[in-house]
Swiss-Prot record:
It comes from Pasteurella multocida (strain Pm70). One of its GO terms (molecular function) is acylphosphatase activity. The lineage of its organism: Bacteria, Pseudomonadati, Pseudomonadota, Gammaproteobacteria, Pasteurellales. This is Acylphosphatase. It is an enzyme of class 3 (hydrolase). Belongs to the acylphosphatase family. The gene is acyP.
């Protein structure tokens, strides 16, 4: 399993982005979390197969119709923490 961190920029807070990301992640079957960041972006950490993470990345570039995604930065996530589900963090 691979671990990735995605930082999503644009109009992504206050538009249901975390909820829809959670719902999509559950459908895809990845584990990890989504949370708002202080700079107005959204952080997503996900653990899954190459295919699952590619599906999530594709969805993040579009987001829900209430959002306006400008950029998604993807990088390896080196933290050794294990995840048992996908959660919304506050």
């Amino acid at each position: 399993m691979l671990k990735k961190q995605f930082i999503v920029y644009g109009l992504v807070q206050g538009v249901g982005f975390r909820y829809f990301t959670w719902k999509t992640a559950m459908q895809i079957g990845v584990k990890g979390y989504v949370r708002n960041r202080d700079d107005g972006s959204v952080e997503v950490v996900a653990v899954g197969s190459t295919t699952q993470l590619a599906q999530l990345h594709t969805w993040l570039t579009q987001g829900p119709r209430t959002a306006s995604v400008e950029q998604v930065i993807e990088q390896e996530y080196a933290d050794s923490r294990e995840f048992t589900d996908f959660s919304v963090r506050y």
